[in-house]
Amino acid sequence: MTESLPDFEDLPLDRDAKILDHHPSGLVAIDKPVGVLTHPNRKDEKKARTLLRADYDFQEERYTWVDDAGGKRSLHLVHRLDSPTSGVLLATFSAELAVSLRKSFAARETHKTYYAIVREKGKARDGHWKDRLDEVREDGKLRVKAGRGHEALAKVTFERRRVGRLGLSLIRLEPITGRTHQLRVQASTRGFPIVGDRIYGDFALNRKIARASRVERLCLHATSIELDFKYQGNPIKFYAESPLPRIMGKLLS
């Protein structure tokens, strides 16, 4: 999409975030960097890096700021990514569109693709992962475990197996549901801990890889999102893609 809109020019993005694509409806796809919060935590320190350098309204799920001309601006989040996960994140200047797209996400009408680098300990097999996940609090921190809670569904494809000097594998994950920490837990419980996962991963492996390659990040990247919506009465198909980070590709060489 080549149209340039003034609304997109002065977004107070984090220094490493960038716009991947946008649409005249106000929809924008942002490449969220690793370690950056989608939005600030309610009790978070001011120093934490967030997607936008702006105030956040938790009730409305939007960032607000004043532009250079003195105008009040806002950007509504459509969905979220965990802080250690990088990749495609959708937001919009339209409150109405935000509500509509959030419903599309809840109704499983969007197609999302992630890539993860894992160590194979389980039996590698393409197919679908189906679980029930429980959210619990441990020492005041949110943790997710297999249990009897919300249904979690994802399609998995083993793209590259035991490659490079570290013998790691690249898997493509297509979540059908969007539960908290879903992909990280589903991979870990099946014997495929994601490299760099400090909660559900293989901590000894993480240390080994950090020493060998200096890669310490969670190797989970939201590669693409595809969705349909209507704009001015016309059906729109929107697709945004973020390439695999170079530092992750380095682990596969």
Would you name each region that the model predicts?
Residues 1-253:
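RNA pseudouridine synthases
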